[in-house]
Amino acid sequence: MNPLASSAIPAVRERDHVTGSNNPKLTLIEYGDFGCRYCFAASRPVKALLDRFDGLRLVWRHFPVTELHPRADLAAELSELAGLHGKFWEAHSLLLTQHGRFSNDDLLSVARRLELDRAENQAALRERRFRERVLADIEGGRRAGVHATPTFFVDGERLDRPWADLAQIVPARLAAA
């Protein structure tokens, strides 16, 4: 049985948050939730893969599960504001380590650590300036069959095995590329 299932995953877009290779042989797309402990757990092995393999790139798309992680949508919106200042991946790391603690004070603390302007941050979250961007990622994930986080796609195919299996799948796919 193929651990990678076909899906309707959107191609990598200009607005996506991307790290890793500028000339990738393999693309991982992760639908994630900053409040999800499994997304936090997956972040270190995925980072290790990015550090190990030059031909790998990672795309993050938001999929906050607010029923389980209240205010994870606001954390996603904060990361979008950080992205405007070239600090998305720094925000990504900090927000994952919050383990779902996303009170106003928690989010302000993260924004302060990112050296984001306090007034801009407060206005962006109050006005929900990035809500539509986050909702678009969620809708794209739903169309692609995402139901839980983290969900990974390897070159457009959904990984239907535990995310830990990426440690075997990525090297094999890169070797075949």
Predicted segments, located by residue:
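N-proximal helix/coil linker or "cap" segments that precede and/or mark the start of modular domains
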Residues: M1-A8
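N-terminal/domain-start segments enriched in small and hydrophobic, helix-friendly residues
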Residues: L4, N23, A164
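A short beta-strand-turn-helix
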Residues: A8-L26, L50-D51
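C-terminal cap of thioredoxin/glutaredoxin-like
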Residues: I9, Y31, Y38-A48, S109-A177
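Glycine-rich, flexible loop/turn motifs
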Residues: E14-R15, N22, V59, P64, ...
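Short clusters of hydrophobic/aromatic residues that line enzyme substrate/ligand-binding pockets
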Residues: V18-T19, F102, L125, L159
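A structure-centric signal for secondary-structure junctions around beta-strands
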Residues: N23-K25, A75, A148-T149
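Structural alpha/beta surface segment adjacent to cysteine/selenocysteine redox centers
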Residues: T27-R118, A176-A177
